[in-house]
């Protein structure tokens, strides 16, 4: 049976992650309070941040920036908007 969490991002109960996705206290908090769906949404946001800002993940400053954005995304006022990103128009719109 899937582990359920009260997802802080979705505002409802949803399937939880299988393991903490990040080390330390932040990873434990994400594991306890974030659903698989919300984590997948963050992974898409993180990918856009890396690509649009041309972040080099070998650079410690880039990794620290992403960690701050992840914390803001889940537990703060939201991650930085991706500059230049225009969401796709839904079909028939």
UniProtKB/Swiss-Prot annotation:
Name of protein:
Probable Fe(2+)-trafficking protein
MF terms from GO for this chain are: iron ion binding
Q: Which family does it belong to?
A: Belongs to the Fe(2+)-trafficking protein family.
Q: Which GO terms describe its biological process?
A: cellular response to oxidative stress
| InterPro entries, per database record | Fe_traffick_prot_YggX, Fe_traffick_prot_YggX_sf
Which PANTHER family does the UniProt record give? FE(2+)-TRAFFICKING PROTEIN-RELATED (PTHR36965:SF1)
The entry's keywords:
Iron
Which domain of life does the protein's organism represent? Bacteria
